[in-house]
From Swiss-Prot:
Taxonomic lineage: Bacteria, Bacillati, Bacillota, Bacilli, Bacillales
Disulfide partners: none
Protein's UniProt name: UDP-N-acetylglucosamine--N-acetylmuramyl-(pentapeptide) pyrophosphoryl-undecaprenol N-acetylglucosamine transferase 2
Pathway: Cell wall biogenesis; peptidoglycan biosynthesis
Record-level GO cellular component terms: plasma membrane
Length: 352
């Protein structure tokens, strides 16, 4: 029986692509383990999936000054030793890393044990963790074809993004019942990320009188961001977040308004949903969402509205443009084959 160790964490985006791949490896009888941090989100997610989970020490990798930068290198070193010992006991055939600060000790621990290491990078340019890990890896899979120019040619493989199978199996009838919507108006689903997005939430709510004339709205507004005054608004349903219902909601969705995190937008792409993307500004991030959004716009998958340009009028204008050019967006979206990503990655895992 072949063995694999997965790693990746710090945010859900560094875990969910692993969850897309794991079921296929289970079908092929791989022995699967996961190494992550003691208290990261990856621990909560993976333990629900009935996968052996091992914790190691980890320190955050920062690009800015913080007093914790003095302590964290020692935590990383401790994490490398933890990972080295654990990997030596597990004896995997390959390690697959999705990035995030916890992945660096695991990658180095694997390299020290002479285990082949494969990386996956979701964004247009590699994050700090993958930049460090790359020197210890044999291959790096990229989600965006343009990302290849930032990486060593001999290591890079373009795959697209692995998308969880359950996301593709939504039921429209269940969504209609859950939301209390009719079939008469198109549905817009608005997502601002797990914590929400204050400016998006406020602008959407200001624009509701105009939007609800033509559309029904599902608003995933983030923890603590519900507006009690809108709870019984006809054609408008708001949630802090949804879990099992999300595939059904996406099945009934005609257009998506969203941030431009790579994993989410590739799920929308695979589902062929035209998008209005409002990326995190470069002042609130390293600018990766802007690059992601602009790539999708160039390929005809999405329209981009920059956060500093978000107003009620600009939001309504962009929604109307999506609706007016719906067929053109659909034609572009059909060109993408999302199923190839998982099969390509599994092939290289098996060959490692």
């Amino acid at each position: 029986m072949k063995k694999i160790v997965f790693t990746g964490g710090g945010s859900a985006g560094h875990v969910t692509p692993n969850l897309a791949i794991i079921p296929y490896l289970k079908e092929d009888n791989w022995d699967i383990s996961y190494i992550g941090s003691h208290q990261g989100i990856e621990k909560t997610i993976i333990e629900k999936e009935d996968i052996l989970y091992y914790s190691i020490a980890s320190g955050k990798l920062r690009r800015y000054f913080d007093l914790k930068n003095i302590k964290d290198p020692f935590l990383v070193m401790k994490g490398v030793m933890d990972a080295y010992v654990r990997i030596r006991k597990l004896k995997p055939d390959v390690i697959f890393s999705k990035g995030g600060f916890v992945s660096v000790p695991v990658v180095i621990g694997g390299w020290l044990n002479r285990v082949p290491v494969l990386l996956h990078e979701s964004d247009m340019t590699p994050g700090l963790a993958n930049k460090i890990a790359l020197r210890f890896a044999s291959k790096i899979f990229v989600t965006f074809e343009e990302a290849a120019k930032h990486l060593p040619k001999e290591k890079v493989i373009y795959t697209g993004s692995p998308v969880r199978e359950e996301v593709l199996k939504g039921n429209r009838e269940k969504a209609l019942a859950f939301l209390g919507f009719s079939r008469k108006k198109p549905v817009i689903t608005i997502m601002g990320g797990s914590l929400g997005a204050k400016k998006i939430n406020e602008t959407v709510r200001e624009a509701l009188p105009e939007l609800l004339r033509k559309y029904q709205i599902v608003h995933l507004c983030g923890r603590g961001n519900l507006d009690d005054s809108l709870q019984n608004k006809e054609g408008y349903r708001q949630f802090e977040y949804v879990h099992g219902e999300l595939p059904d909601i996406l099945a009934i969705t005609d257009f998506v308004i969203s941030r431009a995190g790579s994993n989410a937008i590739f799920e929308f792409l695979t589902l062929q949903k035209p998008m209005l993307l409002i990326p995190l500004s470069k002042f609130a991030s390293r600018g990766d969402q802007i690059l992601n959004a602009e790539s999708f716009e160039r390929q005809g998958y999405a329209s981009v509205l920059y956060e500093e340009d978000v107003t009620v009028n600009s939001l309504i204008k962009h929604v109307e443009e999506l609706s007016h050019n719906n067929e053109a967006y659909k034609t572009a979206l059909k060109k993408y084959n999302g199923k190839e990503a998982i099969q390509t990655i599994i092939h290289h895992i098996s060959e490692a």
